[in-house]
Amino acid sequence: MRTGPSNETGSSTKATEMTALADAFRDTFAVEYVTAREVMDRRAREVGSRPMVLVDVRGEEERAVSVIEGAVSAETYESTRSTLGPHDCVCYCTIGYRSGQYAEKMAKAAAGGTDDARYFNLYGSILAWTHAGGACVVPATGERTTRVHTFGKQWSCVADGYEAVYFKRPLAKGFGQMVRGWFGRKK
């Protein structure tokens, strides 16, 4: 893993980079998007509304660095979703590609069934979360952190005040995760 300085460019430049990355595939997935600010506002008024679950679909090594406070892994979500009742599932990854795939897959699987979940993709994912000033925590300790795993250097456009951590060889790591996904998960 490598660590990138959080102040390589100005915050507005990094926000522009993040938006360009997120917009590059926004129309790729047949899912609704929600912004980081909308999630934050909804969490602030959660009482009496439909429950919302944040699902981090990134790999275990990425999640070990930090997650959005209150998020669960895809594995945890899948093993507990039948006990949640009607809820909204907001999926995220680094920039929104993997979470878009996951949200679309889950929405298709739920269609026509008894699953009363609605699936959303967090626009810009954890990168957008940093630009909105959202809290991240280390899952092992629950302590707040400004370190965020961005998978690869090209996605390290976290907001000022956050530190990007990424794989040295993201394509090799991504291919390994993809292969494990093919053979390691039940459909």
List where the protein language model places each region.
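Glycine-rich, flexible N-terminal cofactor/catalytic loop recognition
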Residues: 34-49
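Rhodanese-like catalytic fold shared by cysteine-dependent sulfurtransferases
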Residues: 2-37, 60-88, 100-187
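Active-site-adjacent beta-strand anchor residues
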Residues: 56, 92, 122
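Gly/Ser/Thr-rich loops at beta-strand to alpha-helix junctions
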Residues: 94-100
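Sequence-level motif detector for i,i+2 pairs with an aromatic at +2
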Residues: 49-50, 69
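Structural motif
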Residues: 53, 88-90
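Short hydrophobic beta-strand that contains or immediately precedes a catalytic carboxylate
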Residues: 39, 51-58
